[in-house]
Amino acid sequence: MTRHFLDLSAMTATDLRTIIDDARVRKSATKAGTAEKPLAGKMLAMIFEKPSTRTRVSFDVGMRQLGGETLFLSGTEMQLGRAETIGDTAKVLSRYVDAIMIRTTDHRRLLEMAEHATVPVINGLTDDTHPCQIMADILTFEEHRGPVKGKTIAWTGDGNNVLHSLIEGSARFGYRMNMAVPLGSEPHDKFLNWARNNGAEVLLSHEAEQAVAGAHCVVTDTWISMNQEHRARGHNVFQPYQVNGALMKHAAPDALFMHCLPAHRGEEVTDEVIDGPQSVVFDEAENRLHAQKSILAWCMGAV
């Protein structure tokens, strides 16, 4: 059976834990110069319909560190789903490469790719979810604070794709998920309902202080995601959800701060917080590399 990595909800808790534990080992081996290359001779196709820095570099470097190679394919060059159906593209690519990573807008394009591909398909990001980011976040949290199970993670800001995957992660990893968003920016009900139906404790409010109270980790993201540049910046409904020193005082004394980057300093987070001692954003960015190496290895049967 082909191993896809599409969403945390599509994975078992056991498989996700296996990937996190493997990432920890691979990271240590990389630092020690003893890392193995289990994907030697393998080729990863990377399809980008949305631009990226971290996703492209981390998958490219990660695949190379595992001994494999990558092929970059831009959405404009491929005309995915226009000149050729996504299903046909998936079938053709499956004859050439050993895995496909796609970063796209419409989540349905990811699912259609996986439906027709005979090689693993990995979700590099869609407008709905961003599971690779949450794997990096869990790895980072546990490096600094130990097991995430039973801890409280708080989100403040927009109800976007990263939050959707954090919500799914709460059911799979066993952490409590608090979130505060402005009216009209709530996460999609299907993610909340799925998490609650799978045993997660999730709290949705519109008060940042309420969500952050006692939290072990505070997470935010840009208020303006790609394709949302029409929304006003700065002085808008998101201002009360800014992560600043005053808000962090409501969290646990040793709470971590996370942000998937890029950050708009002075908007969703202040310099005081992102550059402060509680911030682990650059560890988090590095761990995209290590978490995704283990996702790649798991998908291709090397874990």
Swiss-Prot record:
Say where the protein is mainly found.
Answer: cytoplasm
Q: According to its UniProt record, which protein family does this protein belong to?
A: Belongs to the aspartate/ornithine carbamoyltransferase superfamily. OTCase family.
Q: Has the keyword Methyltransferase been applied to this entry?
A: no
Q: What is this protein called?
A: Ornithine carbamoyltransferase
From the UniProt record, report the name of the gene that encodes this protein: argF
| PROSITE patterns given in the database record | CARBAMOYLTRANSFERASE
Top-level taxon of origin: Bacteria
Q: What is the lineage of its organism?
A: Bacteria, Pseudomonadati, Pseudomonadota, Alphaproteobacteria, Hyphomicrobiales
Report keywords, A-Z.
Amino-acid biosynthesis, Arginine biosynthesis, Cytoplasm, Transferase
